[in-house]
Amino acid sequence: MSVELTPPRSDGSVGFAPVVVPPAPRKPLRRRAVSDLEKLYKVKRRLVFGADDGAVDNDTSNNNSGSSSTTSRSRRKTAADVVSDSPKRTDDSSTAGEDGYTHCVHSCACTPGERHLLCCELVSIGDSVSVARCPLCSLGISTTYLSRGCCRGRSKVTGGDEDEEDEDEEENSQDEDRDEEEAASASSSGGLEWSDDSNSALSWSDENIIISPFPGLKCYVTTFEDIRQPVLLETGSAYLPVYVPYDESFCRNRCLERGGDDDDERDATLIGKGSFGQVWRLSDKKTALKAAASESINETLLTVWISGVVRSRAQDAGYRGELDDSVYCNILVATGSCLRHNLVSFASFDRDLYNYRGWHYAGLASYRRAFSGIADALRFLNLRCGVGHFDVTPMNVLINYDRADDRQIARAVICDFSLSQCHTEGTTGHCVVVFQQTKTVRALPKSAYYLTDIYHPAFKPLMLQKLCAIEPRKQFPKPSANRFCVSDLCALGHVAAFCLVRVLDERGQLKVRSTSEDALFGVARKTCDALARHSVDEVANFCSLLITRQLAYTATLLGSDDMREPMARLCDYFETVSDKDAPDRFRSVYKRARREIDGSYMVRLLLAASETEDGRYLLDNIRATCLMVDSEDLDVDPYKIFP
């Protein structure tokens, strides 16, 4: 059983109290693709406020559920969906779509969890490549003949009558004869070797070059000889390719240590579990593995791409890697990955801020250094790397504490890019990852910046939270690198307020968790559940309730006087976009939130903290970030926040 250090008694002694640590609040489910969403007409939404159960008008709820089902039916399948939905076949199925791409589906002996890695590619008809085998099991289409970078051979185009199919077969037969002559000629002149063996698989990618499905991008296998971790290697083209090397010993030493479904086979220890996967600490105590929760490799793609960009940009700026090249500028980056097991490796830390047990007034100076360092990391990530973190929470700040005094934080880093999105100007849609393991090139999903897809509901900046209360599917207002950076810093301000309440409340962390934090996370959990159900009206209602909880948290630290202006601006906004009675309902729910999140037990330590330089630094930056309620506030200088 854990114990919690309580505030010193009057006689100077220290007491201990048993603690039952609740699990960390989960974040929203994975963001939806752009094609999963439809534009909604702007309507005046009647804010419910105080309805904690999320009850909404039935007619409105039905309308939105119908919209969600329509959206789901109209969703365009991804390449992975095409493969997983297709029955296993022994021939090549290739169809030409309206977007100018040929969708090539290849059969292989891989499991569904492995098959999505390569067996379906979007192949440009003009100047790209057809991959005719699976790099994992080396099986695939054996009778596909390739010429001039186009998909040919026994590919059947769906549609048409039998006569047209006969004509196509005759034309294909003539094409095959011509292709055989050209291929034999190319082989004799030193080109790609061609074989008429019907059991041999063909691919344009070989031991020397990886030809990608993206026009103008060629990647050479020899590039991997000089790199050991994911790194960005710019070639002057319109692409930002991150090369991810692979060593066979990675699986032997790391993947297999995590073991299978039987816990007895594992040497690793499970230290974290959430919506996006599991985190394991290996037996060396220095390495952690994050295994994705789903078969999709999108999160692995995003993680290794951001890690490569951060590593490259940091080295260019003169930063040196720490902890085996796993930390740059207080950002935790991946040191390796395995697509077969869909996981990435990092350096291991003691714990995260949410599960940290050493909060104490004596550690105030170290907490200031920690938040200042995380702010530097967010500025570097947004302004130098072109990446918005969009998930700044206590659960995503990892720390090592001082072994001599666990009340002091020795090191803090930002981690977890599950909700991150790229905003590199001029290169959106051109961020690609080159994998040595499969000799393939894959692109990151395009960024959409939908407000419901970014940030944990409990720590979402207020100017975005209020927009979600009216239009949950609204996109980020006037996106830019500066605005994204300020938004991340505002989320960091809410995290600082959350942690400072733990430090200053003399009732101890156990009582804070069961009162103030429960009031905040209780509504946040309902918001996540509503997001999973795609219930737009419930999401809007719970976001409006979260605003009052976030303001109440801030008020316990700053006092009522500082809350008057942001409260007045929010009331004016709700009256304009909703109805004239909305401000009264908002004030009523805010008063109830103030009673639930009680700051009366913080008065003594709060006054003491306000008289110290470290305490004033934290309080001033909480004031600068947690009271931003208008989207225009995002245009401030990010270097003036947590400087």
Swiss-Prot record:
SUPFAM superfamilies noted in UniProt: Protein kinase-like (PK-like)
Domain Protein kinase, first and last residues per copy: 265-643
A GO term from the CC aspect: virion component
Annotated catalytic residues: D391 (proton acceptor)
Keyword ATP-binding: yes
Acidic residues bias locations: 160-183
Renumbered residue ranges of the record's region Disordered: 1-30, 52-97, 155-199
Compositionally biased region (Low complexity): 60-72
GO BP annotations listed: symbiont-mediated perturbation of host cell cycle progression; viral process
Region (Nuclear localization signal): 25-49
Family the entry assigns: Belongs to the protein kinase superfamily. Tyr protein kinase family. HCMV ganciclovir subfamily.
Full protein name: Serine/threonine protein kinase M97
Upper taxonomic lineage: Viruses, Duplodnaviria, Heunggongvirae, Peploviricota, Herviviricetes
